[in-house]
A protein has these predicted regions:
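Alpha-helical transmembrane segments of multi-pass integral membrane proteins
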Residues: 437, 441-447, 466-594, 611-617, ...
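Hydrophobic core of alpha-helical transmembrane segments in multi-pass integral membrane proteins
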Residues: 160-174, 322, 404-415, 470-485, ...
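Hydrophobic alpha-helical transmembrane segments
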Residues: 158-159, 373, 397-401, 504, ...
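Interfacial loop-to-helix transition and helix-capping segments at the boundaries
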Residues: 148-162, 188, 214-220, 256-269, ...
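Kinked, hydrophobic transmembrane alpha-helices enriched for aromatic residues
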Residues: 17-21, 214-252, 259-281, 308-327, ...
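Structural signal for the C-terminal ends of transmembrane alpha-helices
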Residues: 171-178, 281-288, 387-393, 447-456, ...
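Solvent-exposed interhelical
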Residues: 379-405, 450-466
Length: 630
């Protein structure tokens, strides 16, 4: 009986201690009112507390549902579990009438630093707490109330934009179905502008795959595998948080080299940079034999098409992150999502311009969008090389070699002059830096030119050369993955790895593409060219945009501590991928496809105007312009 009474006494003390700390910290940490960037209604948080009746209500809480929904001692403390979340939804749903008073639930989470102590003698009515000798310091408090997500300007803009898209989609789909099935009219003869928002037409176009002459089919598999690898890597990173109840197990699992590939997804970004550079040259050399001066005369179209092609989906995901995604779910860790909502409301323009990897890198609106900013920046400077590639063979090789030498030299000098010891410096000044990521892009341009000059040729490569190339590619790939695992105590080796690792990975990817195109891919080409990859490759850009928000929603909406294991990791990865595919498909049908059609119609109209103007000029006039599509 003595032990039972002792345990009950300790539970009472812990519960009262938690409640008093929650209320006290809440009172002493009011945010400034009137801030336009708040994501929660802190004015509501302030108004619900009546200090005069607080002490009386505290005495009544033990007999209410608060006791059941509140903090419990964490289970598994020896495996690094240090958080007890209580019951988030039960806590917020509490609304009880006790002795003529209405008590509503408020969810509070307090972070404490057990290494420091402080006596809170100023706390009113807590002599019982001081007598126990309990001392602590509060590091931070997170508090939530029911209905504390106010509608802001971003929400109203999102409602207006997506309501307009919905109306246009309904009207366009109705027109399309009426023309196709009621009037039995050939779609070619119907108005393309009126049916550009049609769900029927856009879905049919998205799911129809036809063979195209000169297409590199193996790229579909590479794109799909790369986006899955990126989602998996971000799933692993998202699972490393204070709500993971067995972080010790996490570090044990990833202390093994065999599991290093799970968190090496950053190499997939270099794969995308390789593909971007490769397709830039491969398509530019293939479209109507574009000349050097035509590129310069139409450089504004070159830049504009790149921006317009990526802008609709990018603007869509930024607007959703700043508004709709904040309201689709909720949980004990929703501050994880709210932080990104706040950043997107403040710094949305850095993602759209795009300068996200340069301006304010510590408060990025969806931090994974740095890749898109970098890709556009590389396309902006690419004409410095592309101009020479569009000339003779000699000028093309000279331009490509100079471009590769310049990018490698710049990356190497930059890595040797800087120290990336801290995680912040490594991410901001190395991982998301355009200078260090440029070499794979230029390597892709080189192999794009090689594929172009060998288009339609039947190359004969000795078996030993192909075997040696495969061996070198696989060895290099494994080395690049292993480099991320190893801790380099030699500063020279560390800087050399930083300078050339991404380039080595890019060469390995390009070799696989090359042998697949020229007929030496074998089972690798068969696997990468399977039709099952085509759909995911087609929506891979949208998947890259949406997967981060999906992961934020999953881990932000947790209500119990997350138990990490490889099995649970892959379950979360599978669900995140499924939700991402659904969101991406819907966005491609409702946003990307209509905008793509509108861009083509506008470009077609501009081209027709240019042709008409040229036809009206004398015969000695300059030849007509050819617009570049990349």
């Amino acid at each position: 009986m003595g032990n039972i009474k002792c345990q009950q006494l300790m539970c009472d003390i812990l519960f009262k201690y938690f409640v008093i700390l929650s209320v006290t910290k809440f009172v002493s940490s009011w945010p400034k009112a009137g801030s336009p960037s708040r994501v929660f209604d802190y004015e509501l948080h302030r108004n619900v507390l009546d200090p005069v009746r607080c002490q009386q209500q505290l005495r009544d809480m033990r007999t209410s549902e608060f006791s059941d929904a509140s903090f419990q001692v964490p289970q598994g403390i020896l495996t690094s579990s240090s958080v007890g979340l209580g019951n988030f939804h039960q806590c917020l749903s509490i609304k009880q009438h006790v002795k003529g008073k209405t008590i509503e639930g408020k969810f509070c989470m307090i972070s404490t630093n057990i290494k420091e102590t402080k006596t809170m003698s100023w706390l009113t009515g807590t002599s019982w707490l001081l007598e126990t000798g309990v001392k602590s310091i509060i590091d931070g408090v997170k508090q939530r109330l029911r209905g504390d997500k106010p509608l802001v300007a971003a929400d109203y803009i999102a409602i207006a934009v997506f309501l307009l898209i919905g109306i246009l989609t309904l009207m366009s789909t109705t027109y399309d179905i009426w023309q196709r099935f009621l009037r039995k009219k050939d779609p070619v003869n119907s108005n393309e502008l009126l049916r550009c928002f049609s769900v029927y037409t856009n879905t049919h176009r998205l799911l129809t795959f036809s063979a195209t002459s000169g297409a590199i089919d193996c790229i579909d598999g590479i794109r799909s595998i790369s986006i899955l690898w990126i989602i998996l890597g971000h799933t692993v990173i998202a699972s490393i948080n204070k709500y993971t109840m067995n972080l010790f197990d996490f570090f044990v699992i990833f202390d093994q080299r065999t599991n290093m590939w799970l968190i090496s997804g950053e190499l997939a970004v270099d794969t995308y940079l390789v593909l971007s550079g490769l397709l830039l040259v491969y398509t530019s050399k293939s479209i109507k034999k574009i000349k050097q001066m035509q590129l310069l005369k139409n450089i504004h179209v070159f830049y504009l098409q790149r921006l317009l092609r990526m802008f609709p989906l990018l603007g869509c995901v930024v607007l959703l992150q700043a508004s709709v995604f904040h309201h689709i779910s909720d949980g004990a860790n929703w501050h994880y999502m709210a932080e990104n909502v706040l950043f997107c409301r403040r710094y949305w323009w850095t993602a759209l311009l795009p300068v996200l990897n340069i301006v304010n890198p510590t408060q990025q609106c969806l931090s994974h969008l740095w890749y898109l900013s970098m890709d556009v920046q590389l396309h902006v400077i690419s004409p410095l090389v592309l101009f020479w590639v569009l000339g003779s063979s000699r000028s093309a090789w000279n331009g490509l070699i100079v471009g590769l030498t310049t990018s490698l030299t710049a990356a190497t000098v930059y890595c040797f002059l800087n120290d990336f010891t801290s995680e912040y410096d490594n991410h901001v000044y190395y991982h998301t830096n355009t200078m260090t990521r440029a070499p794979p892009f230029v390597i892709g341009m080189i192999f794009g030119y090689i594929l172009h000059i060998n288009r339609g040729r039947k190359l004969r490569i000795p078996f030993w050369s192909v075997s040696l190339g495969y061996l070198a590619a696989w060895a290099t790939s494994l080395y690049c993955i292993d480099v991320l695992y190893l801790t380099w105590h030699d500063e020279l080796l560390d800087k050399l790895n930083r300078s050339f690792m991404k380039s080595l990975w890019g060469v390995s990817v390009c070799w696989i593409i090359f042998v697949c195109v020229v007929g030496y891919g074998g089972p690798i080409n068969w696997f990468l060219s399977l039709k099952l990859w085509k759909f995911m490759a087609r929506i891979s850009y949208a998947m890259y945009l949406f997967h981060y928000s999906v992961l934020y929603s999953i881990f932000g909406g947790i209500v119990t501590p997350f138990y990490f294991s490889l099995e649970s990791l892959f379950l979360v990865f599978a669900s995140a991928t499924a939700y991402t595919v659904i969101c991406s498909t819907a966005a491609c049908i409702l946003v990307d496809a209509p905008c793509s059609t509108l861009q083509k119609l506008i470009l077609k109209a501009l081209t027709s105007t240019a042709k008409s103007a040229t036809a009206e000029k004398p015969a000695a006039a300059s030849p007509q312009k050819e617009y570049i599509v990349v």
